[in-house]
From Swiss-Prot:
Belongs to the UPF0434 family. The lineage of its organism: Bacteria, Pseudomonadati, Pseudomonadota, Gammaproteobacteria, Enterobacterales. It comes from Pectobacterium atrosepticum (strain SCRI 1043 / ATCC BAA-672). GO terms for cellular component: cytosol. This is UPF0434 protein ECA2555. It comes from the Bacteria. InterPro entries: Trm112-like.
Length: 60
């Protein structure tokens, strides 16, 4: 994931910062506890595509 892209994309729910999880290929919003998938290098920033994070995943 290009670091320049991470500087401009934001969570579609809260407009908060997103963090890239390289192992799971997801963009993480810690504020909302959501993980957005990255498919073929393209972030899928749709709320209905997001996965709810467990409490242990948010703190990582």
């Amino acid at each position: 994931m290009d670091h320049r892209l991470l500087e401009i994309v934001a969570c579609p729910v809260c407009n908060g910062r997103l963090y890239f999880n390289k192992e799971k290929l997801e963009l993480i919003c810690k504020a909302d506890g959501l993980a957005y998938p990255v498919r073929d290098g393209i972030p899928v920033l749709l709320e209905n595509e997001a996965r709810k994070l467990g409490a242990d995943e948010i703190t990582q």
